[in-house]
Amino acid sequence: SRKREGMTILPPFNTSEAGINTGRADALYGSISYISNSNKEYVLFTDCNVVCSMNYDKFIKAHIAKDADITIAYANGIPSKIENGTELIMDADGRVTGTGLVDCYSSSVNYSLKSMIIRRTLLERLLHEAHSAKIDDFETIVSKNIKHLRIYGYEQTGFVRVLDSLQSYYDVSLELLKLENRKQIFTAD
């Protein structure tokens, strides 16, 4: 049924052990029992501050076609002044070979949109690894495993903006008043 097979949104779950969540890995670990009991093969997670029109069917098909362990959505360009932004360093095939920190002085780079697809069982393993090492940021645990995992990038093209402040929210809202930008976000299909 739709209720059992559709998308599930996991809110951060605070436990008495963990207290307040300090990062994505910490928040996901709070829901580890739900994740472990799921029958889904893949998990997609994404931040809520990216404005774009992403085709998740194409995203998952690219993940499967590459036989990837993790696929990370990225955009190429000059990133906004995002804090803790991650640059993806990739080979010619799109495999992530390293990461770097995006700063406000960055030129055109492949920057992570913090959306990724991962096999559920691998997610569980990485969350346990992060929890035992007291790593609360999921991107840190992924970066530590770049040499051991098949991590690929998936380029998001078109209108892509990252909201990182009230000012950027206002600026992007103004950009969406332009018909050509709205057409890239709100498609007929």
Where are these regions (language model features)?
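Left-handed beta-helix
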Residues: 121, 130-189
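Glycine-/small-residue-rich active-site loops that bind phosphorylated ligands and cofactors
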Residues: 16, 51-52, 80, 160-161
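Conserved N-terminal catalytic core of the sugar/cofactor nucleotidyltransferase
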Residues: 1-51, 58
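Short, conserved catalytic or adaptor-binding loops enriched in Gly and charged residues
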Residues: 2-3, 7-8, 89-90, 141-146
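Conserved core of the sugar-phosphate nucleotidyltransferase
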Residues: 53-124, 129
